[in-house]
Amino acid sequence: ADFIEPDLVATKDGVLVARHEPNITGTTDVATRPEFASRKTTKNVDGVNEEGWFVSDFTLAELKTLRAVQPLSDRDQSYNGKFQIPTFEEVLDLAKAEGTKAGRTVGVYPETKHPTYHAKLGLPLEDRLLAVLAKYGYTTKASPVIVQSFEVSNLKYLRTKTQVRLVQLVDANDVNADGSMDLTAPYDKPYDFAVAGDSRTFASL
């Protein structure tokens, strides 16, 4: 691989881990763990109510007792139960190790998932991300890191703090037959725009 692309969310104790969403119901075996049954709850993630278990309700130590599973039934299930949830630092270590084996640089392309959601929980992602990147010496445009986000304000904040490359992602509800974006709410705009009452959509970006 040229890059490893982890989606980042925050644990209860503020550690960045790689999960596609804050809700880990489908991507771990948490639903089978009786010791965590009481953690099942409903949270609003970017304007959508979701039921399940959420990373922000678990410490890193608790998350490490869980095992990852493949949520899509049509994909390979043979790795279910074999791996822990990796921290962002573990992903960076993996990239370095694999790069050394291959004799070339393997970059990391992290996405800050749901920044507004995390900020409301008191677990903002940005400074935590910057601290980890600085620990690894990744602070310049030449660093093998590209940070991406569907929101705008957090990227603007990051730009004031680091010179690493940043990418603005765009989303939509679907793609129309003519190739245009189906900008149906709540997938029509960055969530920080929605919270701020900003009328612009992803098409404006």
State each model region's role.
Residues A1-L205:
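Phosphate-group recognition and catalysis centered on beta-loop-alpha active-site segments
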